[in-house]
Every structure is written in C-alpha cells, then in structure tokens.
C-alpha cells in the first residue's frame, strides 16, 4: 500500500522499479491495477488510469476510486473478475473564504453563504463515521454566524 497526499506525488523511491509511470504518476488499468502488476493497485493523486488521462486530480475522483477498489477487492477475494472504473462527475465545490463558497454540478449552481453551509454539510456526510458526521454538522449548524441559526430560533 502506498499513501500519498497533495497533487504531485513523489515517486523518487520507484526510480529503479519496473512500475510504469506516465505524467509523473503510476499507470493503472481501468480496474485500478498497476500495469504489469495485477495484484497491486494505485488510486488517487499517485495514479493515472489508461484512457482516462483527463480525469481531474480531485478528492471526488479519489473517493470514487477508493470505493470502486474496495468493491473490486471483494470481487477478487470471491475469485470473480474486477469491474472497470467509471467516473461519475458530481460537480465541484470550492471555498471562497470565510462564510462564502460556490457549488456547481448536477444542473445547478449555488454561491454565497448557503453554498458555504451546504458545502460543509456535504463534507460532513463524507466522513467515515456517522457519529463524527453528526458532531461536525451540528457544530457548524449551531455556530454564531451560521445561516441555519435564523431557522433554529
């Protein structure tokens, strides 16, 4: 397993390795298997999928790859063929400073304070544990400057 964070992975430790690289990232097939190493996988910023070189280097892609890889590993354990990865574009979210954000995708665009709060809740929903999700969401909702404060009076 290789862990990487950020948008430019450090592959210097693989210089003498037989792992194929492209654009400074590990080349994987559409099952997320490292090319020529069928029992090794790479996902996220460190990898690039053959035929999908234009995928953005974002958390959205990495999270979808992670979920897909987990499902494929389960299939492989059951001695079934892995399925090819298919990216589903769910839009983009960006913070624009304290209390401001923009969300676009799924046919709409939202910006400002409401987008800021929605973005926070979406991130909270992605936390791995429901308890942590609820703690994060409730702390944000009950903050002094939260737009939800108006609705809770």
Predicted region positions:
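FAD-site-proximal beta/loop scaffold in flavoenzymes
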Residues: 1-67, 71
